[in-house]
Amino acid sequence: MTNSCDRPLITPLEPPNASFIHISVLSQETIAGLNIIPGGHYLDATVGSGGHSRLILATFPDVRITAIDRDSQAIAAAASNLAELGSERLKFWQGNFADYPGKIAEFSGIIADLGVSSPQFDFPERGFSFRHEGALDMRMDQTQSLTAGEIINQWSETALADLFYQYGEERRSRSMAKHIVQQRPFKTTTQLAEAIAQTVPPKYRYGRIHPATRVFQALRIAVNEELSSLERFLDQAPQWLQPGGRIGIISFHSLEDRIVKYRFRDSSWLTVMTKKPIIPQREEQLKNPRSRSAKLRLAERHLV
């Protein structure tokens, strides 16, 4: 397999999935925060189906976008959704945003929405959701080898417990890992979710927050190396900004938000613009419940 650092900017070849539609969160706040300028070149590091990119391209007719995603289905969907705004204004790069070979002062602004796209949750075969029966997959880049099934069925009890605690912040990590090892192998998401539910008192098994929520988060983070990728990306991305350019990162859980907060604060390239993160207005939360945990942080590259 070719190293993703060597991948050229691509023309998407995979046909778009008509149902790959994702509602971007904090859209207006993000666009306002980036302060889009005429003729600007922007990096959408997690393009998804293209929601944020569409708003950026709509601001001025000469704005350009370089769009990244690990998911080939997302790249195809974004290319289709954004084509009417001018394909010559768009370049796509498939891979991990931490591996993008950016250049010093290449971009007027950078946006990354770290949430899992709604279609990834809603397509059972992707294995991200415990609410739909599917294989234990969870790969954003489906060319990689490690899956959630491999972790669940092959890792030791101690390794699983540590994973659930560190990446899921799950207080019952030890008992859950022990039960999983006793009951494995698991083939489907719903099998695993039901096994996890059996480790908590009956009154907590089917409440508003499913007992498997944090375990599934931990597995997804591990499969996709999400936190280490975010750290590597934030170590590089500020240098890719032009002086006065801005970077906005939307996170969805405390582990991500903590990394963004301290990477922004400690960067010698950036001035933090958001002392506290921006969160969705109540109206947006009601329209899109998945936006409830979103947090936007913004920073600006120093002028000199």
Swiss-Prot record:
UniProt keyword S-adenosyl-L-methionine present: yes
Enzyme class, spelled out: transferase
GO MF term (any one): rRNA (cytosine-N4-)-methyltransferase activity
Transmembrane residue ranges: none
Subcellular location: Cytoplasm
Record EC number: 2.1.1.199
Family matches, as Gene3D superfamilies: Putative methyltransferase TM0872, insert domain (1.10.150.170), Vaccinia Virus protein VP39 (3.40.50.150)
Catalytic activity, reaction form: cytidine(1402) in 16S rRNA + S-adenosyl-L-methionine = N(4)-methylcytidine(1402) in 16S rRNA + S-adenosyl-L-homocysteine + H(+)
Top-level taxon: Bacteria
One biological process term in Gene Ontology: rRNA base methylation
Residue sites binding S-adenosyl-L-methionine per the record: 50-52, 69, 97, 113, 120
A Pfam entry, by short name: Methyltransf_5
Keywords, in A-Z order: Cytoplasm, Methyltransferase, rRNA processing, S-adenosyl-L-methionine, Transferase
SUPFAM superfamilies according to UniProt: Putative methyltransferase TM0872, insert domain (SSF81799), S-adenosyl-L-methionine-dependent methyltransferases (SSF53335)
A GO cellular component annotation in the UniProt record: cytoplasm
PANTHER family tied to this protein: 12S RRNA N4-METHYLCYTIDINE METHYLTRANSFERASE, S-ADENOSYL-METHYLTRANSFERASE MRAW
HAMAP family linked to this entry: 16SrRNA_methyltr_H
Job description of the protein: Specifically methylates the N4 position of cytidine in position 1402 (C1402) of 16S rRNA.
Family designation: Belongs to the methyltransferase superfamily. RsmH family.
Protein name: Ribosomal RNA small subunit methyltransferase H
Organism from which the protein derives: Rippkaea orientalis (strain PCC 8801 / RF-1)
